[in-house]
């Protein structure tokens, strides 16, 4: 920040972006360039009086020159545009004129930088040969999710304050250290807030840009869109058997299970196999040297967590235990195994990792900015919310490493868990589902195919689930509140996550928390029904 001292613009930006402040006292010539992708320079001067000097000082100009020679610089000015004539604008990557040094100007500028607010203004004066009167570009916000007044989408703004209250009460009651909550309607965000902190030590506030371990939301955010595409292309049918999809399932008790059965959780596949327990010492749950080392090597190359590496064949041994697992009687049995099995089918067919398939087919087309497997490849720890202090397997604080034990043995990339994301990116994927495969001019799959996946096929057998999606319980009592439509769909995650979309009201709800920190034994989120109560409040806020 140059010019007048001010924290407001930085605080507004920090809610949207994972940013750090460069102090004026820094030696800019010795800046660690690898640490920053770009630098935002704001210049603020009082606009209360025309007699107040609002020009850039010589020191300001030198700082801008130094920074722009090292890294991409976004210059945001809250002052008279005539002052820009003294700056070498050729080195500036982006220039945003906000004019007014007030709260509205700072708020609008912060949203414009992250693509949530339109930019339509033109220069009212000429400031250089290159930037003349009338210059300027028009940038529209992402075609999805502009931020709007709740009333514009038929929502009572005052009623939403009850969600704020419930969130704060939940944090005070140690339901979770913090949370992100988003609600959208008609493709527009009317509620998007962060509450609390990363941990109960309150050292770092939750930002909207922070990412959470979303646990089983991975099933519908990563694996399911790819499977729907495969179905849409005729590569997978509902009556396709596991044995026909991959030879690894032949001559096993899972050979004849159909895609429809396993993805509707009707096949009798058991909920999970705690394979990791076999790799620990019984007396103290410490990793056995037979399977783990604290240093990476050719033989121990599966990164389980910080400073813990699994043996090269550990994932194979685990997968064999999943294939060899017993079957229960057919009926609704929610399980992690179906999406793990389908991950194998996809990876074997395309000779690509699920991570690569997700990036190629989902993340890049949707322009997701904050959704990753193995997030430490993309983010600093400060922007990742920890999930647990693990004293039963990895013996470490889990931050940036998947919480789920089965996914952990798989190196963090799995069909059932492993994805990290924030509320905004999740809402994008849910909006794509809500629009039945269409998003911003792209068609991910046909609407007819989506309808087939959002249908309950085993309702008469007492199974509420669709193909991959969770659905409301017919008589209530589930994650959703009783008044939600049967057409609605979504999923929940073990770490304290939840997302739901309703085609009838066109409302999307995203709730992220780390209720498992510091211990997954904390069940207050479920016991106090926080997510369901918040969803009910959203529906009670509907005006029309």
Regions inferred by a protein language model and the residue ranges of each:
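Short, conserved catalytic-motif segment at the N-terminal edge
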Residues: 154-214, 235-237, 404, 520-521, ...
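C-terminal non-catalytic regions of proteins with extracellular/luminal or membrane-system context
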Residues: 1-154
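Solvent-exposed loop/turn segments at secondary-structure junctions
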Residues: 45-48, 79-84, 101-103, 220, ...
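Short active-site loop at a secondary-structure junction
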Residues: 173-182, 202-262, 325-338, 414-417
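Short, gly/Ser/Thr-rich active-site loops of penicillin-recognizing serine hydrolases
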Residues: 23-24, 124-133, 435, 439, ...
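Short, surface-exposed beta-strand/loop micro-motifs that present aromatic residues
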Residues: 488, 495-508
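Short, surface-exposed loop or secondary-structure junction motifs
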Residues: 254-486
